[in-house]
Amino acid sequence: MKRILAVDDSTMNLKLVENMIKGEYQLELLGSGFDALAYLENNTVDLVLLDLLMPEMDGMETYDRLRELENGKNVPVIFLTADTDIESEITCLKKGASDFVRKPFMPEVMRNRIRRVLELDELTHYLERKVMEKTAQIEKMTFETIATISSMLEARDSYTKGHSVRVAEYSVMLAERAGWREQAILNLQHIALLHDIGKVGIPDHVLNKPGKLTEEEFAIIKSHTIIGADILKEIKSIPEIEAGARYHHERYNGTGYPCGLAAEEIPAVARIIGIADAFDAMNSKRIYRDSLSSEVIRKELVNGKGTQFDPYFLDIFLQLFDEGKLRRRKESE
């Protein structure tokens, strides 16, 4: 049964409301705005019937303070008043009130208004749930599609298998610890999964060369940032996805590539991915070397603070490292 809170300084008016709708709804009858706010601190309701003209705290002030409460910010409100001033009605509706009922109350009008507002509120919540469900489905499909693309790209080299998934995992952990919002973290995850997509344009004999690269070959490798950015530039649904591919090899002191950006010029997503990318490279076996020890990896990370890596994000990453949150890669992975 729906719960309605009726607030009016007139006991007679509260009794009228009770007689009109008793049996249809669970009712709570209170005589002041102060009592209503105190009640909503610990209770939820489906609708508030709020008298506009009350002593000490009128309906307008009660409404404003009600919207500041967790249990009151979304609850529909119908104003009740004997005031015939049309401006009052306009003001209430502009504030976000669901309806406006004038005194003396007409039983059938009151019941219909209440029923209409509750049905509309229920429909709104239903649609919001459906939108959230559909959004979650789309996000799941997006993640799975991006992860599949990433895995297909990395299938060219067994030594980098799973690299982008791990970089995404470490990037998300860092952003969560840094207090990023949920949507920004989800975007970062997608960006990190595709940060190396430009390697699709690098020839195998260069990408998988076991020995030292020539200057010409290294220039080809570096071009994967530009290729990746060009591939991703038309994707508008994930903010900064192009920046992640283009700038994840920039260095904090301005000596990176492809643009030589420094410090805050480098987008935050790229600064985070750059740390996660470097960590996973050191933490993984490569065609030309074994994975490095934890001691060596930590030393290399610290040595890169303020030169290769953003100091703020690196300090957070080192916290995760020291807490054992960053897994050592198994040779079978």
PLM regions: where:
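Two-component/phosphorelay signaling modules centered on CheY-like receiver
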Residues: K2, T11-L29
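Helix N-cap/capping motif at the beta->alpha junctions
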Residues: L29-A38, G59-E61
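Active-site beta3 strand of CheY-like receiver
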Residues: N43-L50
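Receiver (REC) domain active-site loop signature in two-component systems and cognate sites
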Residues: M54, T62, L66, C92
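C-terminal output helix
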Residues: V101-I114
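Metal-dependent catalytic cores of enzymes that make or break cyclic nucleotides
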Residues: A147-E333
